[in-house]
Amino acid sequence: ETVRGAVLSLGIRRMQDIAMSCCLLKLSPSADCPVDVTVFWEHSFACALLAQRFAQKIGYPNPEAAYLAGLLHDIGIIVNLWMLPEEFSAAINQAHASHVPLHEAELDVLGLTHCESGELLAERWKLAPEMIEVIRHHHHPESAREYRALVALVAVNDLMCRMRRLGHGYQEEYLIDFLEQPAFAILLAEFPNLKKFDWARFTFELESHVEEVQQLVTLVYKAPK
């Protein structure tokens, strides 16, 4: 009855999303994997945690959806790693060398980004529409047609993580003014109190969760099989 109650409470679609995320998180990199996949899941866990906390603070009505969206937003990275390992390795090397965002290096090397490949996987696996929208548009939230607040919420926290030691394994060398980001404008239109948001305190909270996230990813990937 407890499981049945949980399913009824969350809804079938949400349970499908959660089950899918669990499957993704148990994917282990092969021995000859050209990059450390755990780095990307550290970023995804951090983004999920921060997105949920941020959602709670600004009054977004569904913090659980924010967590799941943060967790899944970069699944296209795993797709690119599976399908185009050599090309993706070249892209990540270029991103490291140039200190540019990964999606820019992917576009230059692969001709597509993890946003497009992630969208294809999400559609094939029939993830919820809002998750597909986040996966496709989290680097350009202004291009989202639906669920814009959720897309923008994940976009902001993705940037926060990438600027604070929980990115894609390297430091991106460009300055970010969150108040000038399209994602911030989208959120501000819906949550006016965001003008008073304490960014310094929120950044401090992110720093305090770095070790927690790293321990969680280690547990997932290094637990006895």
Whereabouts are the PLM-identified features?
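Heme-based O2/NO sensor domains and their adjacent alpha-helical segments
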Residues: 1-31
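Signal-transmission/dimerization alpha-helices at domain junctions
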Residues: 21, 54-57
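Metal-dependent nucleotide-binding catalytic modules
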Residues: 28-38, 49-52, 60-65, 69, ...
